[in-house]
């Protein structure tokens, strides 16, 4: 079981490294992406500076200017996302084929024992293609997904491909609180 775990971690690291290499070739080294990233950084810093200077004001003209700056920033972010999505689609197709190949190698084998009893909707993933009723048995796909998520995120930080904190703060997320709330946490 330990050998399988180490092999899966190596596979996850190798596929994450290959994915980041392909992304670098297709996206990060292009002049268009570099221009978009520099523009995004510049607009983000400018917006943060304006927000700090203005603070909480009731002037509608200043608020409109800030809203326009935020819209420009969102448009640049959207352009960057569209540029990256094209290569991510190709990488996704390639890794889906690799995943099915690796999944067939480890089919029916317990690769690890989970130290917890997984909740219902995760059991389908953690116990996929395994024989038996012990839900603490871990399948290849579950361990691979966990390792890939962890390795890829850290690899992006190490290689410098992860967005800066200021840019990440500006990117819209359905779970992120609105900018006007919780400013005291920043």
Swiss-Prot record:
Residues annotated as transmembrane: 7-27, 88-108
Subcellular localization: Endoplasmic reticulum membrane
Stretches of the chain found on the membrane's Lumenal side: 28-87
InterPro entries documented for this protein: EMC3/TMCO1, TMCO1
Cytoplasmic-side segments: 1-6, 109-134, 152-186
A Gene Ontology molecular function term of the record: calcium channel activity
Record keywords, A-Z: Calcium, Calcium channel, Calcium transport, Coiled coil, Endoplasmic reticulum, Ion channel, Ion transport, Membrane, Transmembrane, Transmembrane helix, Transport
GO biological process, one term: endoplasmic reticulum calcium ion homeostasis
Superkingdom of the organism of origin: Eukaryota
Family recorded in the similarity comment: Belongs to the TMCO1 family.
UniProt protein name: Calcium load-activated calcium channel homolog
Taxonomic source organism: Caenorhabditis elegans
């Amino acid at each position: 079981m330990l050998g399988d775990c180490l092999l899966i971690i190596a596979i996850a690291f190798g596929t994450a490294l290959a994915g980041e290499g392909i992304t670098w070739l297709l996206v990060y080294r292009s002049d268009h992406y570099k221009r978009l990233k520099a523009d995004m950084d510049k607009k983000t810093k400018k917006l943060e500076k304006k927000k700090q200077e203005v603070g909480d004001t009731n002037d509608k003209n200043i608020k409109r200017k800030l809203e326009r700056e935020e819209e420009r920033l969102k448009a640049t972010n959207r352009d960057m996302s569209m540029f990256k999505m094209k290569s991510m689609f190709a990488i996704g197709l390639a890794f889906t084929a690799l995943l099915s190949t690796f999944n067939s190698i480890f089919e029916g084998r317990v690769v690890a024992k989970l130290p917890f009893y997984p909740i219902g909707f995760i059991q389908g993933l953690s116990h996929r293609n395994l024989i038996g009723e012990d839900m603490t048995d871990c399948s290849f796909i579950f361990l691979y997904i966990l390792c890939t998520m962890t390795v890829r995120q850290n690899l992006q930080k190490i290689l410098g491909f992860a967005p800066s904190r200021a840019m990440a703060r500006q990117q819209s997320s359905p779970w992120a609180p609105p900018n006007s709330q919780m400013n005291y946490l920043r």
